[in-house]
């Protein structure tokens, strides 16, 4: 049986969690939280990182930072994403404006996003998909030209680069996920990167339940008080300790995943006239090899191959169900054909297994089998 995902483990997690028991501080914002934040800051070359209990929480902090209560505000984002991307802003009262995807990348199309900017637009959320980038530098130029903010949903992109810049550090804000389905994880955790300095203090207040606690701890304020509408957004020290062990194993994790990804890529790239898409390796981007996917010629072919792979005890999954045609999206006034490309291509994409317990040869076998099944479908 080839599972779609198996959570990564380093064998150091239990030791670090045992150390939390020795230190006797469990609730969060302690030794291991700071250690994780320092590691992330050094790894991606930024100053301002807040460890969160999820990527969803990181997005929710951004939404609270940008919300002008009482004003009509819009946020542009792709429909092809996880629900949290939209829900974080919808909960804060933003009007959600869904944009089309580029079918070749399955990421937000810059021309369509540009066409939807209005005087009420506060920002654009780009979602980096599968360990590949959504051309953040071009979106940064677009946002700068229109005096709006760029938010990177980099849930799947920790360790990825666009040129020499880490994804998640190019916009005003970057949001990472350390959910157990990601390359590195704490079961459930995340991080917020604040690249726009004017939001650093407020972000810290929101992260600290809306209080100035961090300023009091640093001796910058003498009274502990409520200064902002915030929430409970940081993880426990148990989660942070688990994540610390994972982060320290970044290089090993990266090299293993690259080898497995290469097994898929070598087979698909070596076959011609396939009639479907798969991830493109580009000199402009460096991947973290989070996922390998195939976009087939039609939904029927995709379903046929997914079900046939099950017969070989191989678990493969479809991508996201588009948000604009979901129950909530329909309630917002959207119809499925409002974003025809998103609706069409979301039914044609299949993610193949990729986790550190696989081998390069296993990926090659699955790739060869996928091509064989595609030919079988077309006969």
Across the structure, where does each feature detected by a protein language model lie?
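N-terminal "arm"/small-domain region of PLP-dependent enzymes with the aminotransferase-like
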Residues: 1-26, 225-227, 353
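Phosphate-binding glycine-rich loop
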Residues: 29-74, 88-90, 98-100, 165
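PLP-dependent aminotransferase class I/II
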Residues: 34-39, 43-50, 111, 123-127, ...
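Conserved PLP-anchoring active-site segment centered on the Schiff-base-forming lysine
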Residues: 62-115, 123
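Hydrophobic/aromatic ligand-binding patch that stacks against planar heteroaromatic rings
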Residues: 87-89, 142, 238
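Helix C-cap/helix->beta junction micro-motif
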Residues: 92, 145-146, 312, 377
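Active-site phosphate-binding strand-loop segment of PLP-dependent enzymes
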Residues: 104-186, 191-198, 351
């Amino acid at each position: 049986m080839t599972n779609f995902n198996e959570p990564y483990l380093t064998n150091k997690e239990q030791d670090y969690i045992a150390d939390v028991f020795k230190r006797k501080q469990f609730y969060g914002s302690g030794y291991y939280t700071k250690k994780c934040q320092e590691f992330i800051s050094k790894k991606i070359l930024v100053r301002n990182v807040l460890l969160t209990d999820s990527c969803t929480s990181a997005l929710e902090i951004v939404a609270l930072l940008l919300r002008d209560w009482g004003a009509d505000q819009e946020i542009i984002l792709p429909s092809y994403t996880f629900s949290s991307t939209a829900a974080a802003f919808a909960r804060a009262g933003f009007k959600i404006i869904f944009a089309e995807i580029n079918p070749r990348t399955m990421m937000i199309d810059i021309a369509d996003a540009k066409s939807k900017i209005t005087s009420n637009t506060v920002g654009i959320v780009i979602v980096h998909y599968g360990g590949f980038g959504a051309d953040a530098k071009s979106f940064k130029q677009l946002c700068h030209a229109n005096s709006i903010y760029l938010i990177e949903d980099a849930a799947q992109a920790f360790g990825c680069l666009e040129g020499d810049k880490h994804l998640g550090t190019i916009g005003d804000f970057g949001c990472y996920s350390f959910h157990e389905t990601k390359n590195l994880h704490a079961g459930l955790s995340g991080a917020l990167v604040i690249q726009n300095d004017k939001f650093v203090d407020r972000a810290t207040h929101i992260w600290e339940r809306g209080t100035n606690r961090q300023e009091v701890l640093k001796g910058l304020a003498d009274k502990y008080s409520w200064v902002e509408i915030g929430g409970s957004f940081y993880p426990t020290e148990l989660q942070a300790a688990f994540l610390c062990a994972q982060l320290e194993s970044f290089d090993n994790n990266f090299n293993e995943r690259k080898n497995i990804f290469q097994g898929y890529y070598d087979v698909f790239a070596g076959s011609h006239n396939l009639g479907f898409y798969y991830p493109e390796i580009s000199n402009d981007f460096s991947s973290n090899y989070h996922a390998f996917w195939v976009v087939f010629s039609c939904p029927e072919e995709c379903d046929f191959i997914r079900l046939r792979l099950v017969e070989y005890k191989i678990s493969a999954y479809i991508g996201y169900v588009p948000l604009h045609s979901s129950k909530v999206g329909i309630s917002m006034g959207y119809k499925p054909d409002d974003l025809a490309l998103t609706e069409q291509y979301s039914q044609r994409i299949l993610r193949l297994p990729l986790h550190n317990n696989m081998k390069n040869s296993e990926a090659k076998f699955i790739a060869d089998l996928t091509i064989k099944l595609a030919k079988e479908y077309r006969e």
